[in-house]
From Swiss-Prot:
Its main location: cytoplasm. The lineage of its organism: Bacteria, Bacillati, Bacillota, Bacilli, Lactobacillales. It catalyses: L-glutamate + ATP = L-glutamyl 5-phosphate + ADP. It comes from the Bacteria. Substrate binds at residues 55, 142, 158. It comes from Streptococcus uberis (strain ATCC BAA-854 / 0140J). This is Glutamate 5-kinase. SUPFAM superfamilies: Carbamate kinase-like. Catalyzes the transfer of a phosphate group to glutamate to form L-glutamate 5-phosphate. The keyword Transcription does not apply.
Amino acid sequence: MMKRNFDQVKRIVIKIGTSSLVQENGKINLEKIDQLAFVMSSLKNKGKDLILVSSGAMGFGLDILKMDKRPSDLAKQQAVSSVGQVAMMSLYSQIFSHYQTNVSQILLTRDVVIFPESLANVTNAFESLMAMGIVPIVNENDAVSVDEMDHATKFGDNDRLSAVVAEITKADLLIMLSDIDGLYDKNPTIYEDAQLRSIVTEITDEIIKSAGGAGSKFGTGGMLSKIQSAQMVFANNGQMVLMNGKNPRDILRVLEGKEIGTWFVQEKGN
């Protein structure tokens, strides 16, 4: 079996989901954000390029506006996300600054990466920010994204967005933090004997079939979108680690080669 070795990894995209940022009671998980900021700042100080793709605008918005559930009306959803995005970035900026790290905000819609000119502009922005030692924090621009057939500008969810960001920035590794330990051979919430897959070298039909089901009440991404993200990463000859986000310091252990989560990597020659 292939051995994990991330010594040559220079550019890392980390994706954190709403379930890792917002607690079950709807309150923001400050401890986790602090850990994440510490880890990313430590890696930046070692010369790595870091990009964070962060969900959570809706969760932050619901908390600030004291709403206990996501509105069903699209315009209201966009309003709540818009409020939450400001709060989320404010908190990120504050906490990252404790570790002498500056952050920036990049809000994307799908059409930005489809058109060559806007894609070149956003790619240049990423490169400039990282050259200045700044950590770009990326989210979908929920207030203007639409999902209509004639003008679809949504990525679908931030799992797929993180794979797109990894592609356009030519990242060496995508680390996806989730509320699960990785990819299992069957659903661990149903089957007690479900086994965690340490490595996946090929996305088979069987894996896709076993990855049904949706996400948490605050987020949108389920296991299927993570598998689709891995497919996108493979299409660009990249690699991805899917791991539990409950302890962001585990990112450092993963990069040391510890077998945490599921490592998606193609065998040489594929």
